Design a protein with these regions (language model features):
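N-terminal glycine-rich FAD/FM-binding segment characteristic of electron-transfer flavoproteins
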Residues: 1-254
């Protein structure tokens, strides 16, 4: 079985700076694998047998130049890495991202696609579903467990009040939740071995992809201004204090 696990590179949260204008400055933010996609990579690694092949795939812009992240991905189980780097994909929204991934996936070849439930930045929860629609494949989201029985997959979906159990044949698309596993911490041997694994880098033209007319535009990302604390402390439980607390709450809600 050939498994492709797709991931996104996102800025390191602790390096993002909020400006006085309540916008976000990413200039000094290093790249990392989206936390939800670490679960997808781990799910692929746990599912695969010795006869299977795991490929990791991502599309994007300048963040893909980070060699440390490339080694991080390959140290977590995938046998090879595919990158589609193009300026048009720098800030691509879910539809364009999905179209680029689908084009690359068709070129690579696959049996099973595994995605995280969303990305660590936009968390749109759309890309895996859109890829399945573009490729006309069955898609199951909210996957909390995967078992393999020959060429059949037994999938669990943990819902609010139920756990669904679904039998599925490949090819298919799975979108896994963050509860499905605990991503591994790569060993030193795995990190050193990652440097010997193949990395395939393409441009948009290599997969016959071009940016479509946008149906939506990301105008900007702003941080809501923080509300100043009132520093009112009521330090007893007398009826008068309770009444005072109620009065403050009424003022705050009105």
């Amino acid at each position: 079985m050939k498994i492709i696990t797709c991931f996104k590179l996102v800025p390191e949260e602790q390096d993002i700076v909020v400006t006085p204008e309540y916008t976000l400055n990413f200039d000094n933010a290093d790249a990392k694998i989206s936390q939800f996609d670490l679960n997808a990579i781990e799910a692929a690694s746990q599912l695969a047998t010795d006869d299977d092949e795991i490929a990791a795939l991502t599309v994007g812009g300048s963040l893909l130049q980070n060699s440390k992240v490339r080694k991080d991905v390959l140290s977590r189980g995938p046998h090879s890495l595919y990158l589609v780097q193009d300026a048009q994909l720098e800030h691509a929204l879910p539809l364009d991202t999905a179209k680029a991934l689908a084009a690359a996936i068709e070129k690579i070849g696959f049996d099973l696609l595994i995605f995280g439930e969303g990305s660590g930045d936009l968390y749109a929860q759309q890309v895996g579903l859109l890829v399945g629609e573009i490729l006309q494949l069955p898609v199951i989201n909210a996957v909390s467990a995967i078992q393999r029985q020959g060429n059949t997959l037994v999938i669990e979906r943990t819902l609010e009040d139920d756990v669904e159990v679904i039998e599925l044949s490949v090819p298919a698309v799975l979108c896994v939740t963050s509860d499905i596993n605990v991503p591994r911490i790569p060993s030193m041997k795995a990190i050193l071995g990652a440097g010997k694994k193949p990395v395939n880098q393409w441009q948009a033209s290599d997969i016959d992809w071009s940016q479509s007319a946008p149906l939506a535009e990301l105008v900007g990302i702003r941080v809501p201004p923080q509300t100043e604390r009132k520093h009112i402390i009521i330090d007893n439980d007398s009826p008068e204090a309770v009444a005072e607390l109620a009065e403050h709450l009424k003022k705050a809600l009105n």
